[in-house]
A protein has these predicted regions:
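Surface-exposed, low-hydrophobicity beta-strand/loop segments enriched in small/polar/acidic residues
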Residues: 1-143
Length: 143
């Protein structure tokens, strides 16, 4: 696992966004901006959405393992097609190289199901089907 969310390619970094009072976000999650311009977890499972991913904030001493809580600030990036990044795959999911992934509706990613919109393709296999599995970063290429 790399120590950074962005692995290669292009992106538009958006700095110092406030986390909404009801949100807890981690690097690698898919996010959205609410009507107040605050970060929230992208809330619609399998839907088309802006590819806005929470980043680690190394300038504040944060890593890919840190959590951002309500009222704090975080950096995010709009990831361009063809770019590679690590995203947070939901516990209980299993992907292999080449599987399409999409949002779960709570900020993490899942393997694409029928009638959902793909956001990225898995670049590595990850099996989180064990009962004690936790959300885990996995490398993807954004579509």
């Amino acid at each position: 696992m790399s120590n950074t969310i962005i692995l290669s390619g292009g992106y538009k970094k958006i700095q110092s966004l406030t986390i909404n009072s009801s949100a807890t976000l981690k690097p690698g999650m898919i996010a959205a901006l609410n009507s107040s311009g605050e970060l929230i977890a992208q809330a619609t499972e399998g839907a088309a959405c802006e590819k806005l991913v929470i980043l680690e904030d190394a300038l504040q001493g944060k890593t890919v393992n840190d959590t951002y809580t309500a009222g704090t600030v975080a950096d995010a990036a709009v990831i361009f097609p063809g770019s590679e990044a690590q995203v947070l795959l939901a516990a209980t999911e299993k992907v292999v190289v080449g599987d399409y992934v999409t949002g779960t509706g709570v900020g993490t990613f899942q393997k694409l199901e029928a009638a959902q919109v793909p956001l990225a393709v898995a670049l590595e296999a990850c099996d989180l089907t064990e009962s004690d599995a936790v959300d885990t970063l996995v490398a993807v290429r954004f579509l």
